[in-house]
Amino acid sequence: MCMIDHLDDIMDAGIDCIKIEGRAKSAYYAAIVTGAYRHVLDDVAAGREVDPVWRDEVEHVSHRHYSTGFYYGQPGQYYDNSRYIRDWQVCAVVTDCDADGNATLSLRNKFAAGDEIELVGPDSRPFTMTAPVMHDLEGFELYEPRTPQTVFKMKLPRYVPPMSFVRHAVSLGAKD
């Protein structure tokens, strides 16, 4: 279920508290979805036009086909495909970053220098960049860190707060 496109209706109905449904959601999932909903709720409450980037963000997490559940009647069962959609993957988590963008990260999934990646963090729109050559903690160049939890250094174009995510499109489509 996804109600991000209908938060105005929810607020008009007098509902002032919502929650994410589901079990065992990752920190990435919780951060992306709550951030997107928070931005849309703030826009709706302020009477501003909703920035479409926040709707797009909920497509960047692992999910099944989205629906509005029973909010607008009984839509019937969705039989076409119950597989998860996993078109984006977390590559790394920023653990530290200075004002110049010199960041320390912890690897989650492999990626390589030259890959197109996105950085997404609290209170900021995602931004796209090309992954630079990285360095291990001893200063040696890393072109493709592969071992999960590897700590490495990477130059970012600007400061990003700790717990920001590096992600990339995986072009794998829906998988079980």
What are these regions (language model features)?
Residues 1-176:
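Surface-exposed amphipathic alpha-helical tracts and adjacent flexible/coil segments at the periphery
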